[in-house]
């Protein structure tokens, strides 16, 4: 510990603490431009200069650690004069175009000059000028080089946190520009974090350009509706219209960063295609009707249904999901309840809940990042959970840590990995079993996984020598026909590691914002809220469709889920629902599933409701209403209350009941959920008691010379489900789908990036452009599931697992 005196105030801090941080702990604010806590130290802007007793020269506080007995002055005349001079140097070239700059009103340079800057400049020379018109870098980013103050926040966050390394400095001195190599932006993730960290108006958002001033916006703190990382952000709205989404420094687990879909995926809220009126099918066609007529019809049909079921989206709030299962169980008398959950069966979802300890206490990702070894399996985390990717990359900068990634495709995070294993899709259970055997010193058999025994032994050695291990299990386990077995093999691996006295935790990587919350709330055929076992297991999604296909489902309630577009066998899903006696769909768009409904109820988007999400850590966070639902729509909670006769006045009332039913939530107060939220505190519950069945037969049968490629799917970095396709900005960034293959396959076939090919499976075929991904596993093809005009689920057949395809170069 070191005791220092700052402006006469004595404070004791940890050895090595920066003077800047010590001063802030003591209550003294020091201005900075180049410094940000999560970025590497630069010390270039010199705004943070302070005087240290006994030293002649002022020192940059952002790179200078305290020493015991040090005396520091941050506000004397010498420091103030130096600070004003630095601002004068910056203003010598900075254009004073504040009235037309989008950063006006929230510009750090503007604020610092007002507080500490000179009132008259010592410089009269002509200002440096790179261009007269701003440069449009992409559909989301505008660059004004004239305003840049060379703090290099943009360069460092792109390189160190995002991992894109799309930006760098060219030129020298005052002529330096922060830009991309030859302005190509080949590696840009379009996340907009350069916009967020820019202290001036050099990087700007094109969708927000000239739309508003910050003081005109009504700002609402909420949580991202896409993946389950649970990023916090702030919605800026004016006159009921969402104009931007931004993040706040060191706020939430995302710590100011957002991905492209989080920052730019909001325009679907104002889409012209939003549902604005209830509809009832009359004479074979949907027609607008009153709310009273629509709700009465739903009540009547479910009251008279012999067998009914409900499927809900994991993008709904905890409160909505809780009421949905309460409505289905208490009012409609059925346990046939499930969420999309990547359409896994109840045995697989139960295994995921059990193996990842979702009924136990939540585990913060920051604690998981403290592990000596991070093991990711079954997830394209860079695409499915981009901000989790950022957090893992930041942790991996510590070279004492080991990062092992196992996934068939090469992903961006591979650049930070110590070991990268490319296994054959569907063989996850074999790979994990082989790693466990190697850890236990047994013979390694990795038949059909395409991973060499030497690589498995190397990974096992790294795991065996680590004392603190974090395992991340991805959504591929929920997609895979062998997912349950793979999860149970992970459980066997954790037991083997724990038996040697090591600390190991398993966390899920989920691709829907409230998937964990859906299970916590009892939207599951086996579990009630709080993971109490239901009296008689109900049907999961697949079983509901099976029953419906045989004419055995009288009424189906589908809330926020597009079953036809997303279920892995579109033809079967459509055919099954066509035989249901009655279908009600509650959604914000007229999806393919909604088009089949007998009644359609228009609900609300995440920006139009209050409630909570529970992210993949088990962190409960508030979402807050920023605007009213579009004219004619109603909040989902309101609709459920009307159907069930519930008398809750607000989401907080429902949450109070959740606390009684789900013990892990009992100590959480709805109105006190600010900042980083609260981790659930449950108790260990053994749920499955299942044993893995090594289904090598399914993997071995995958060999097929006629269809040599295994086709896998998932989310693209710029999209999540079909929802983000309604955001025009994201659609502009990735306007059309593609098929991705490995560099080895492309070389053998004589195919290059951009070539048109036909992807032909047993049940479907499409024409797409090729993207070549060097480092991916040979024999694996990938098509994102996000494109409405290319329904990749048509390639799948229920019960057959991973489809096989052939790729034919178009002439």
Language-model features: locations:
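Short, structural beta-strand-to-alpha-helix junction motif
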Residues: 3, 17-21, 317, 424, ...
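Short beta-alpha connecting loops at secondary-structure transitions
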Residues: 5, 68-74, 180-181, 219, ...
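Structural motif
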Residues: 6, 52-54, 761
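A basic, amphipathic helix-loop patch mediating RNA/tRNA/ribosome contacts
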Residues: 19-53
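Fe-S ferredoxin-like electron-transfer domains
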Residues: 46-225, 229-233, 238-242
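Catalytic alpha/large subunits of respiratory electron-transfer oxidoreductases
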Residues: 91, 95, 151, 156, ...
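Long, contiguous, secondary-structure-rich segments that constitute the structural scaffold
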Residues: 442, 450, 624-680, 724-740, ...
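Long, low-complexity segments enriched in small/aliphatic residues
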Residues: 487-491, 655-733
